[in-house]
């Protein structure tokens, strides 16, 4: 019973962390550094 409770708490913690990462995704070009572009919510380096 105790291991099940620990497993559920860990699963909830992981879900919250994943949710926070998705919320912090970039939405426009101004959120990334000068040499990066916002592509599909992720700051990617410019090529070239």
From Swiss-Prot:
Keywords: Amidation, Disulfide bond, Secreted, Signal. Residues 1-21 form the signal peptide. GO terms for cellular component: extracellular region. The modification Isoleucine amide is found at residue 47. Disulfide bonds join 26-38, 32-43. Expressed in salivary glands. Highly expressed in the head, body and tail with a 2-3-fold higher expression in the head. It is found in: Secreted. Residues 22-27 form a propeptide. The keyword Secreted applies. Belongs to the annelide toxin family. Does not show effect on voltage-gated calcium channels, potassium channels, and tetrodotoxin-sensitive sodium channels. Does not show activity on Nav1.7/SCN9A, and shows very weak activity on cation channel TRPA1. Leech salivary gland peptide with unknown function. This is Peptide HSTX-VI. It comes from Haemadipsa sylvestris. The lineage of its organism: Eukaryota, Metazoa, Spiralia, Lophotrochozoa, Annelida.
